[in-house]
UniProtKB/Swiss-Prot annotation:
InterPro entries tied to this protein: ATPase_NBD (IPR043129), Gcp-like_dom (IPR000905), KAE1/TsaD (IPR017861), TsaD (IPR022450)
GO function term, MF aspect, one: N(6)-L-threonylcarbamoyladenine synthase activity
Assembly behavior: Homodimer.
EC number: 2.3.1.234
Family per similarity comment: Belongs to the KAE1 / TsaD family.
Keywords: Acyltransferase, Membrane, Metal-binding, Mitochondrion, Mitochondrion inner membrane, Transferase, Transit peptide, tRNA processing
Pfam families found in the cross-reference section: TsaD
Record note on cofactor: Binds 1 divalent metal cation per subunit.
Name of protein: Probable tRNA N6-adenosine threonylcarbamoyltransferase, mitochondrial
Subcellular location: Mitochondrion inner membrane
Catalytic activity, reaction form: L-threonylcarbamoyladenylate + adenosine(37) in tRNA = N(6)-L-threonylcarbamoyladenosine(37) in tRNA + AMP + H(+)
Residues noted as binding substrate in the record, renumbered to the chain: L217, I218, S219, G220, G221, D250, G265, E269, S373, N374, T401
């Protein structure tokens, strides 16, 4: 008997990449899964496409069947399998990335196409222009990743792709490409949460990293403190109530007239080395808020006012500034960086205490995301982590910024435990509507740290990854 998966809203069910665990219908894929999971499976039937009232609108609905995997191999530590090979595709913001990763953790290839010129031209990410840039290079990036791995699509076990959070226009490019590859070569497809990928890539580089662990995920669009209980289950201890730290770094770099080709973070970090970090008095945000949430909008305002007071002209690049002007810019950069990281330190310290109350066995804290490549950030946070008798785990800078490796690895982790979807149709109409999740929480909020984020009050938010997986698990239990 076929059971309709009803735990998600109709808006989400269009492209639900985390349904109840599915078994592929094609015999060759069934053999593949039997090999990886050492399980014998029956061949189920699927009803995938269900048209809506509009003749030009098609909606994918996923069904689970009477044939289910109730228990799959799972390990709190990374589970390595040489036979698995996954292609990961990432287009959530301004980098077009693809990578091929083997189940044993070997990175076979990694390709990234940057939009640095567009960032300079528009002073940040322009969604429509970013989408067009992704579309121009996505085919080449994916092909280059396969070529560098000396593989073809036929050698892949699955395709993983970021479906959120991120910019809808950009996400769509990656999802469309992933579905075409998966459909043309009858490959399973795994939808990946962008922030979970930032956290889990640390398990690729640090084999001792087991659940549960703490994670601070810091980037241009996100500040997240999460407790990772196990794969797919997270508690959100803190988030940003307005702007993320990466956004503050980018704006500071722009106002100081720095070179934005490498993004604002590295530019501010480099200039800060020349400055006095205590010369400009900035207030630490949310100093008296006894939670783990972040706010960088006010610090941005303080920086802008300090720049105006020094009459710094952003149109004059720092390379052309006078000695005094350059020193003023360096002092502001250093002072900003110090206070921005102090804010991280205070919230991280409290979050670790909360996490240890919930999961006393925690041994590691992961720091990942684009801002985690900042050496000053790593140094300061390492002191906090060591004082709590934990070990800091930071992926190398190339895996902190957005990349295809983290998507492929996260896809591997979920694929091993049966969280994937069957191959999509080989052809889909141009107006096909995908389920993209631009605002998609990673975990459930911890009661002590509930956020009052302005950006979240009116935005359409999908159920968190954790709640989706938990709901399906409960539904399976009630039927067994």
């Amino acid at each position: 008997m076929v059971r309709l998966f009803l735990t998600l809203s109709p808006a989400i069910s269009r492209f639900n990449l985390y349904p109840g665990i599915s078994i592929l219908a094609r015999n060759n894929n069934s053999l593949r899964l039997q090999k990886h999971h050492k399980l014998k499976t029956k061949t189920p039937t699927f009803s995938l496409i269900s048209p809506s009232s509009s003749p030009n609108f098609q909606r994918t609905r996923f069904y689970s069947t009477e044939t289910r995997i109730s228990s799959l191999p799972y390990s709190e530590n990374p589970n390595f399998d040489d036979n698995l090979v996954v292609l990961g595709i990432e287009t959530s913001c301004d980098d077009t990335a693809a990578a091929v990763v083997r189940g044993n953790g070997e990175i076979l290839s990694q390709v990234i196409s940057s939009q640095a010129e567009l960032l300079v031209q528009y002073g940040g990410v322009a969604p429509k222009q970013a989408e067009e840039a992704h579309s121009r290079v996505i085919d080449k990036v994916v092909q280059d990743a396969l070529d560098k791995a000396n593989l073809t699509e036929k050698d892949l076990s699955a395709v993983a792709v970021t479906i959120g959070p991120g910019l809808s226009l950009c996400l769509r490019v990656g999802v469309r490409k992933a579905r075409r590859v998966a459909g043309n070569f009858s490959l399973p497809i795994v939808g990946v949460h962008h922030m979970e990928a930032h956290a889990l890539v640390a398990r690729l580089v640090e084999q001792e990293l087991s659940f549960p662990f703490m994670a601070l995920l810091i980037s241009g669009g996100h500040n997240l403190l999460v407790l990772a209980h196990k794969l797919g289950q997270y508690t959100q201890l803190g988030t940003t109530v307005d702007d993320a730290i990466g956004e503050a770094f980018d704006k500071t770099a722009k106002w100081l007239g720095l070179d934005m080709h490498r993004s604002g973070g590295p530019a501010v970090e480099e200039l800060a080395l020349e400055g006095d970090a205590k010369s400009v008095k900035f207030n630490v945000p949310m100093k008296y808020h006894k939670d783990c949430n972040f706010s960088y909008a006010g610090l941005k305002t303080q920086v802008r006012l300090a720049i105006e007071a020094k009459e710094i002209d952003a149109k004059c690049p720092v390379s052309s500034a006078t000695n005094e002007d350059r020193r003023n810019r360096a002092d502001i950069a250093a002072s900003f960086q110090r206070v921005a990281v102090l804010h991280l330190e205070e919230k991280c310290e409290r979050a670790i205490d909360w996490a240890l109350e919930l999961e006393p066995s925690i041994k590691h804290m992961v720091i990942s995301g684009g801002v985690a490549s900042n050496k000053y950030v790593r140094l300061r946070l390492n002191n906090i982590v060591e004082n709590k008798n934990l070990k800091l785990v930071c992926p190398p800078p190339s895996l902190c910024t957005d990349n295809g490796v983290m998507v492929a690895w996260t896809g591997l982790e979920h694929f091993r435990v049966g969280r994937y979807d069957p191959p999509p149709p080989a052809t889909e109409p141009e107006d096909y509507v995908y389920d993209l999740r631009p605002r998609w929480p990673l975990g459930e909020e911890y009661a002590k740290g509930r956020s009052e984020a302005r950006s979240m009050r009116t935005a359409r938010i999908h159920p968190s990854l954790t709640s989706i997986i938990r709901a399906d698990s409960l539904q399976q239990q009630t039927q067994t």
